[in-house]
Amino acid sequence: MTAAASTLALNLARKLYETGIRSQSVLSAVANTPRELFLDNALAHKAYENTALPIGQGQTISQPYIVARMTELLLQTQPNKVLEIGTGSGYQAAILAQLVPQLCTIERIKALQIQARQRLKRLDLHNVSFKYGDGWQGWHNKGPFDGILVTAAASKVPEALLAQLSDGGVLLIPVGEDAQQLLKITRTGQSFESQIIEAVKFVPLINGELA
């Protein structure tokens, strides 16, 4: 990161602290991640604003607050292996890869997946496995997962993701269409406990792959 970008990233982390993010590891990851790397040059000047931004293909890079909030919630159980549904730009994956031993991430849009893989390689983040595929189905061969984080809103909670949670594992997923809620679902044996965290606004989680 350039000195200017480093200062902006640190200021963003401070703003996130002011909005309620308390995990120092999450704030440090935000401060160490060049968000402009995950945006087109035309939007790079907005990289450290606390707002979602378009990345093409009808998708967005999530607001830094929600990235930090979901990451903080996920880390409460100290997960070893995490599945991300919706790689998108790769920014959320870059944050997670600094904080968990093993990250698996799925993207249904091939062009975005290729870009994200290149960006994480550039940041020397090598504990990430990438898959081009349908996020609704999860990644059965890599499961079970201690944590699953979904970066798009589902109309309902996908059964495949619940099945791929380990005992004690946590699924964080936005659910709903017009009115969306971020849910935290914890697995205990064959039971699942759901907690509403807060209202959110995400792009929809769509079935299938897009070349």
From Swiss-Prot:
Annotated active site: S62
Matches recorded under PROSITE patterns: PCMT
The reaction(s) this protein catalyses: [protein]-L-isoaspartate + S-adenosyl-L-methionine = [protein]-L-isoaspartate alpha-methyl ester + S-adenosyl-L-homocysteine
Catalytic class of the enzyme: transferase
Enzyme Commission number(s) of this protein: 2.1.1.77
Xref: InterPro entries: PCMT, SAM-dependent_MTases_sf
Task performed by this protein: Catalyzes the methyl esterification of L-isoaspartyl residues in peptides and proteins that result from spontaneous decomposition of normal L-aspartyl and L-asparaginyl residues. It plays a role in the repair and/or degradation of damaged proteins.
Protein name: Protein-L-isoaspartate O-methyltransferase
Organism: Shewanella denitrificans (strain OS217 / ATCC BAA-1090 / DSM 15013)
